[in-house]
């Protein structure tokens, strides 16, 4: 049975890309942001995409007709949605209730359209605000081969996303961006290995010696260096409150990709350079050649990349649908 996907609040096309990678047919994508629609169309010219402000009850009938049409053709129809989530994020100071209307609208749409399966991606805090009985899980992108520990709530039915990577096998930034080794260019001297052995990435740098320039480790800024809402204590690296610089070595998965570039630093730390957009696309699970020119400005590009669903996670959801349909 063929799988048809309707992708709502589609952005630049992360879920659409993953669905296509998994062998599904995306029959419609919808978003209200003109630049995101243009980028989506540029990368998926064969997918019908509509620029439309979602959230009105009058839209239910339109999507119900589409579900019925493709079901009659023998398709399994899957509806996905990624309603805007800024007010629901842990990093937001806005009232979280501001972010719920479109979430509830989407859930109502699913109930009225009755697709064969559905999924909704949002930030983790939305999970506790979902109506009672709404099935949901928290998925970590690193479990699906993405070099980033991006955790998101996925509500839905008709699928189970099976991880492809255990924690021991998570991809580090350096695994997917091996050219960053050129910024390191050293192996710690044997005499220093025990000195570094018990040092965490949050600890002060050891005694500076003539070998120090070759013993600096390349690290990635979390992007939350002064956030008071991250809940991370920079001294211990644990979720116990606090704010301040927070870094992770590049042999580990990236922090969640957001709408601004990650900064590469040394262990002092001292900025080397920011990650480029093609590098950040890779950290999100996209092909680095994914076309962003239609977005016009760098700010628009960073925003849509930071908001995108990592395609490998979307592909895992659709493969979960396939496993349920074909087994």
Write out the residue ranges for each language-model feature.
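Extreme N-terminal starter segment of soluble prokaryotic enzymes
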Residues: 1-5
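Class I SAM-dependent methyltransferase "Motif I" SAM/SAH-binding loop
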Residues: 8-12
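A short, Lys/Arg-enriched amphipathic alpha-helix followed by its capping loop at the start of a domain
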Residues: 18-25, 43
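Conserved SAM/SAH-binding beta-strand->alpha-helix loop
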Residues: 33-34
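S-adenosyl-L-methionine
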Residues: 38-71
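Class I S-adenosyl-L-methionine
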Residues: 59-250, 255-256, 272
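Acidic-aromatic/histidine active-site loop/patch
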Residues: 314
């Amino acid at each position: 049975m063929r799988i048809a996907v309707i992708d709502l609040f589609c952005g630049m096309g992360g879920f659409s890309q993953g669905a296509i990678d998994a062998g599904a047919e995306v029959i419609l994508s919808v978003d209200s942001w003109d630049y995101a629609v243009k980028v989506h169309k540029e990368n998926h010219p064969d997918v019908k995409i509509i620029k439309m402000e979602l959230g009105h009850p009058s839209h239910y009938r339109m999507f119900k007709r589409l579900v019925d049409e493709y079901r009659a053709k023998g398709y399994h129809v899957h509806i996905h949605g990624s309603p805007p989530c800024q007010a629901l994020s842990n990093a937001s100071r806005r009232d979280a209730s501001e972010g719920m209307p479109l979430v509830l609208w989407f859930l109502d749409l699913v109930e009225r359209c009755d697709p064969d399966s559905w999924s909704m991606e949002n930030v983790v805090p939305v999970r506790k605000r979902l109506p009672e009985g709404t099935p949901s899980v928290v998925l970590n992108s690193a479990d699906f081969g993405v070099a980033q520990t991006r955790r998101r709530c996925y509500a839905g039915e008709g699928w189970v996303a099976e991880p492809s990577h255990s924690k021991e096998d998570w991809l580090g930034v350096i695994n997917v961006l091996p050219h960053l080794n050129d910024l390191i260019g050293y192996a710690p001297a044997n005499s220093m290995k025990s000195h570094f052995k018990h040092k965490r990435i949050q600890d002060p740098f050891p005694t500076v010696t003539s070998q120090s320039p070759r013993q600096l480790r390349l690290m990635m800024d979390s992007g939350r260096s002064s956030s008071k809402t991250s809940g991370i204590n920079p001294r211990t690296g644990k979720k116990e409150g606090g704010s301040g610089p927070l870094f992770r070595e590049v042999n580990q998965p990236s922090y969640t990709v957001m709408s601004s570039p990650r900064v590469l630093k040394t262990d002092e730390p001292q900025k080397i350079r920011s990650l480029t957009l093609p590098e950040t696309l890779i950290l999100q699970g996209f092909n680095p050649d994914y076309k962003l020119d239609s977005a016009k400005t760098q700010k628009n590009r960073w925003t849509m990349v930071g908001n995108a669903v990592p395609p490998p996670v979307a592909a895992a959801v659709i493969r979960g649908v396939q496993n349920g349909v074909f087994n």
